């Protein structure tokens, strides 16, 4: 019996889900290795969930199933798809659904004796290691090609950001492992890999520092390092002729599923290959080549195009999933024109697509707020299905204030509320200390973030504990956070004893000047003078690594200054910030709309999608990869089911809107 004729054992309730012929073929396929080539809106995650539910109905135990995703959000979307298809909640919880990196970390935890390795995910936490690595190279006396080394100026944040970006790609692609020179790395080797010699030497030095002197576990792990470390271990085993699964590996794996396979890189693929080595493992992967948004980390849709057949004895069956049941023809047409490929629609869906021009940010915000209010009038259920998608985090300030002032509950996805961003928290903290008004900072989480903001921007370090000479700075920092994050009344003492006393003189001078202004008689210009005295861009330039993050932080403060101009004095404005923070905490989350970055909504869908600030240079971002920016726009617009509303700058419209044929 063919896959198309085979009757399914798992039949979701008709009122929940009625699978299409394409979905049924995938659900019931008997192929041990199945690859699904999908299009946006074709219910990739739902279909993969059907595949898992079918295996479960045929006797596969949850403990013998593994679902791997790129992000936590994708994993949560998969759980929701299982539940939406009628899989009992208890069964949904039993399935192991996790990210590649979390899976790798769990395996490594067993290998490393149960000792957790600290994570350092922020670029700012990795900067000092990069400079230590530069120093190591500089100190090396036996360097054979010193003229090939290009040393940066000390403190060059752009150099650090560029190296971190290069490192993410080099690790994701396993370039040094796959093209390892027989002897010592040479400039010619680097040229053959398409890299600068300095970059590769720096990566080697950085990795030695990360490994530390312990034979069993590294000092820390950065973004995706767990996957990278496990992949290297597996490659070494293969090279040594060892075919033994590491401790912590799934003992019996019957069903293996990979969602968003188009974002797979070489390190993830190496882990996948080892998982595919088990006998009797049924594998299904699904992806869409037009939704690759992690190419900077080595993501490549090519892993769905022959690599498995080339590297294993498996002969994958390839099935299509092209008909979109998320949106109608009015959205399918521009989306199809944008990617230059046909998009099929089914189910008689109707999707409204509108393009509205705006002259400035305030006007755009007003238009978005009006659309949100109109959506809320349709009921709480409709409001909960409404999403505002932003290209940049800093674009949320005016929208957040409008939502909060309008009593409209929202949940943030892929971004922090502007009130909790470090540069804004530092401003709030200084004003709170001067005014002795700690009402809005009383929450432990907020206090913790506030202390971390001072530490980030002021370079605060803690005195070594003579009773614990082995305690590293991370441990001392953790202890201090517990002490100072318990009570807002401790903030003045923290500022005096740990920030001002140990700060760089230039930083301390700016902090004291700002506090002096904050203590003067109030008036309409005091907040502006406070910001000028503080000179927050100076702190941002010293502390933050990535250019886009620095630019975003400055934009956050510009937005804060613009917001303050609507209030008669600093006291009133600070009161507004405090009231906003309190109201935000107290908002009921039922019927909340979603405020998200476009990059955070892959795998999700919404009844209505609003995309503001579509201005050339903003989206597409002028510093972004053209391909990644285009894929990100495609991902964002195809999240909509019933309505897509685009707000386009009237003088500098996004080229993407025109490319989709909507201008």
Language model segments and positions:
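ATPase/helicase motor core of nucleic-acid motors
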Residues: 310, 380-529
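Helicase P-loop NTPase motor core
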Residues: 34-35, 40-52, 56, 313-410
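A short beta-strand element within the Helicase C-terminal
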Residues: 594-622
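Conserved RecA-like helicase ATPase core segment
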Residues: 10, 266-354
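Hydrophobic residues in beta-strands of the RecA-like P-loop NTPase core, especially within AAA+ ATPase
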Residues: 258-264, 287, 611
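C-terminal accessory regions
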Residues: 403, 571-573, 577, 613-663
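P-loop NTPase Walker
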Residues: 1-116, 333-336, 638
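Accessory N-terminal region flanking or inserted into the helicase ATPase core
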Residues: 2-47, 64-66, 146-257, 266-271, ...
């Amino acid at each position: 019996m063919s896959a198309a004729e085979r009757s399914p054992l798992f039949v979701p309730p008709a009122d929940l889900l009625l699978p299409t012929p394409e979905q049924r073929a995938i659900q019931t396929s008997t192929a041990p290795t199945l690859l699904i080539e999908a299009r946006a809106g074709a219910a990739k995650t739902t279909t993969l969930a059907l595949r898992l539910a079918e295996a479960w109905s045929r006797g596969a135990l949850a403990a013998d199933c593994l679902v791997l995703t790129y992000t936590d959000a994708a994993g949560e979307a998969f759980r929701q798809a299982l539940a939406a298809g009628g899989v009992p909640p208890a069964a949904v919880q039993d399935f192991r659904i996790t990210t590649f990196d979390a899976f790798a970390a769990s395996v490594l935890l067993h290998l490393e004796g149960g000792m957790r390795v600290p994570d350092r995910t922020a670029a700012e936490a990795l900067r000092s290691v990069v400079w230590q690595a530069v120093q190591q190279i500089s100190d090396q006396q036996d360097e054979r090609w010193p003229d090939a080394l290009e040393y940066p100026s000390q403190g060059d944040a752009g150099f650090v950001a560029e190296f971190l970006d290069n490192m993410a790609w080099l690790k994701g692609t396993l370039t040094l492992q796959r093209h390892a020179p027989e002897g010592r790395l040479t400039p010619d080797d680097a040229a053959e890999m398409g890299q600068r010699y300095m970059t590769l030497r720096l990566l080697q030095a950085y990795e030695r520092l990360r490994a530390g002197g312990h034979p069993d576990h590294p000092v820390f792990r950065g973004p995706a390092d767990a996957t990278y470390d496990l992949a290297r271990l597996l490659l070494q085993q293969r090279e040594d002729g060892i075919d033994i699964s590491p401790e912590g590996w799934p003992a019996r794996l019957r069903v293996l599923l990979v969602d968003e396979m188009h974002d797979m890189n070489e390190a993830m693929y190496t882990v996948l290959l080892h998982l595919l080595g088990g006998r009797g493992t049924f594998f299904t992967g699904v992806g869409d080549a037009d939704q690759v948004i992690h190419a900077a980390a080595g993501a490549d849709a090519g892993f769905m195009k022959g690599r498995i057949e080339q590297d294993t004895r498996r002969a994958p069956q390839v099935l299509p999933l092209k008909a979109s049941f998320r949106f109608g023809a009015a959205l399918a047409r521009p989306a199809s024109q944008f990617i230059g490929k046909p998009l099929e629609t089914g189910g008689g869906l109707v999707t409204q697509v509108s393009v509205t021009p705006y002259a400035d940010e305030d006007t755009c915000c007003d238009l978005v707020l009006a659309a949100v209010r109109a959506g809320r009038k349709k009921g709480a259920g409709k409001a909960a299905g409404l999403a505002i998608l932003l290209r940049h985090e800093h674009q949320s300030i005016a929208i957040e204030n409008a939502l909060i002032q309008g009593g409209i509950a929202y949940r943030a996805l892929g971004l922090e509320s502007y009130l909790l961003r470090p540069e804004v928290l530092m401003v709030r903290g200084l004003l709170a200390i001067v005014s002795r008004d700690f009402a809005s900072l009383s929450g432990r989480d907020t206090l913790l973030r506030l202390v971390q903001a001072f530490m980030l921007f002021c370079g605060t370090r803690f005195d070594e504990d003579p009773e614990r000479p082995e305690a590293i700075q991370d441990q001392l920092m953790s202890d201090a956070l517990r002490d100072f994050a318990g009570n807002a009344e401790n903030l003045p003492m923290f500022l005096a004893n740990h920030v001002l006393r140990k700060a760089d003189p230039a930083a301390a001078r700016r902090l004291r000047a700002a506090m002096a202004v904050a203590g003067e008689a109030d008036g309409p210009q005091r907040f502006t003078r406070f910001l000028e005295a503080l000179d927050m861009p100076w702190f941002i330039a010293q502390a933050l690594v990535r250019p886009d993050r620095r630019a975003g932080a400055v934009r956050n403060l510009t937005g804060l200054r613009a917001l303050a101009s609507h209030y008669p004095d600093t006291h009133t404005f600070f009161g507004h910030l405090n009231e906003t923070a309190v109201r935000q905490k107290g908002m009921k989350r039922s019927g909340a709309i979603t405020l998200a970055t476009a990059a955070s909504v892959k795998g999700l869908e919404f009844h209505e999608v609003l995309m503001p600030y579509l201005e050339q240079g903003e989206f597409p971002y002028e510093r972004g990869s053209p391909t990644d920016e285009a894929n990100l726009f495609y991902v964002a617009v195809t999240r909509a089911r019933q309505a897509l509303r685009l707000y386009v700058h009237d003088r500098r419209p996004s080229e993407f809107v025109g490319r989709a044929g909507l201008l």
